Amino acid sequence: MADSPNANTRLPAPRRNVIAVLIAVAVIAGGVIGWQNIKRHIFPRHWEVVDQGMVYRSGELSSTLVKSTWEKHNIKTVVNLIGKDEQDDPAHEAAATAATELGINRAFFPLIGDVTGAVESYVGAVKAIVESKSQNNPVVVHCAAGTYRTGGVVAAYRTLVEGWTGKAAYEEMISEGVKPGPATPLVVYLNAHIGEIAQRLVEEGVIEKVPDPLPVFGP
């Protein structure tokens, strides 16, 4: 009696187990990725308070949440750190529309994704935050994910405007998702350029003097 087709094509048990595991992993991974995409439309991306009721930080908000979130927090100024090459998407278009409808001022100070870039972008961003706050206008600063570029600007604001230590600002960066360690590009950049940023803020009338000693970012 000939073997059935199923008997000839049936995979060995070990191989079947491996395939089953791979399928399960793929399903789980797909579920995680899917949830991350769904979550962006339910919760404002990386929305956090810097100064209660006045200064906020975030990632780029989804087109479904940007207007309602800005309106809820009475945002009057948006400090955008995203580069021009990252701004051609529906979320950016929705943000532009929301800003127009809500009468929000948008200020652009682009930084590269690895947080390096022009010192002037840091200076301009910190100055915009301080000016908006001084006029009692709530402000949000954001990049794409709300972690590195936003973390760098907030760290400069914390240390040079609010008087935080470099260590305290570093710990906040880590708590917000920045990779720990003195060799992290953001930490290296801040330690190399914080003096120049401070000097330019003095020249712009944002702070009275360059801190002495300068803040050192690290554990």
Language-model segments: which ranges?
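Cys-dependent protein tyrosine phosphatase-like superfamily
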Residues: A2-V139, G152-P219
